[in-house]
């Protein structure tokens, strides 16, 4: 799977984990050069508190377009720190 935004591959892996129709990419497969920490957080009752990244490519910024769970519930430990995408980021084979 690949996550693409603004013509750049943000993440690529054959080992994503699918949760609620979202592909979560292992952290080591994400090109962190395109990511900047956001101060945005959301809470999922069964996964835990999500932290977000802004994606920046060629001067364009997609705010809070990637998220991950740095601390998870027991049910979500399998994808702790894995990164998922939305807001126009194309995830495809």
Task: Identify what each model region corresponds to.
Residues 1-93:
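Terminal leader/tail segments of proteins
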């Amino acid at each position: 799977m690949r996550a693409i935004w603004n013509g750049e591959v943000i993440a690529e892996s054959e080992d994503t984990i699918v949760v609620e129709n979202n592909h979560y990419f292992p952290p080591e497969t994400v090109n962190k050069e395109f990511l900047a920490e956001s101060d945005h957080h959301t809470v999922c009752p069964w996964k835990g508190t999500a932290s977000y990244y802004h994606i920046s490519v060629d001067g364009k910024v997609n705010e809070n377009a990637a998220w991950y769970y740095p601390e998870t519930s027991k049910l979500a430990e399998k994808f702790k720190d894995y990164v998922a995408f939305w807001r126009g980021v194309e995830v495809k084979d």
